Amino acid sequence: MKIIMLGAPGAGKGTQAKKIAAKYEIPHISTGDIFRANIKEGTELGKKAKTYIDQGLLVPDELVVDLVVDRVNQEDCKNGYVLDGFPRTIPQAEALDKALAELGQKMDYAIDVDVPDENIIHRMGGRRACVGCGATYHLEYAPTKVEGICDVCGKELILRDDDKPETVKKRLDVYHEQTQPLIDYYTNAGILKTVDGTVDIDVLFQNIVEILGA
């Protein structure tokens, strides 16, 4: 079972990807993890990626696809995998499909976790991080015992720049411009399934399981 998780930043697709991977005993693959693993191991692809990352540049699509295809070719992916955070654009999706076709593979599902922008801005605006140990909380969903104070180390909590409404809005604009077209792409491919991401985490997971089959 080969699955792509789609959804805006903060929609909760990463959480669901981990839950799917655990239930179906298939790897949860994110491009960030692939980059880190290849750079740490000093692979040829990792060295190439590092030259871009060190300069603060985006890793070119061609190289990202090579890294992803190399990862999904590994033994632990023979029964399937969940791709989280890739592809992000139509060119990436086309390049991935082409590379998989050459291996005699194709994606089975693209699951879009659909959450309205205003919900995401509200959700992410409620996140807080500890200045001391980095532990994360949420004012509504995972509050601290004492308001504004970390349960773990007692230091103060802050709203990270990444979670400020103006930053989230910019990220959502980029998502709608670059990634939203993938909805049409995978609809045309006949593999898109859209789920309501505003429901409880466990309800959402159950809805995804019903699509994938127990």
Segments the model singles out, each with a brief description of its role:
Residues 1-214:
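Glycine-rich phosphate-binding loop of ATP-dependent small-molecule kinases
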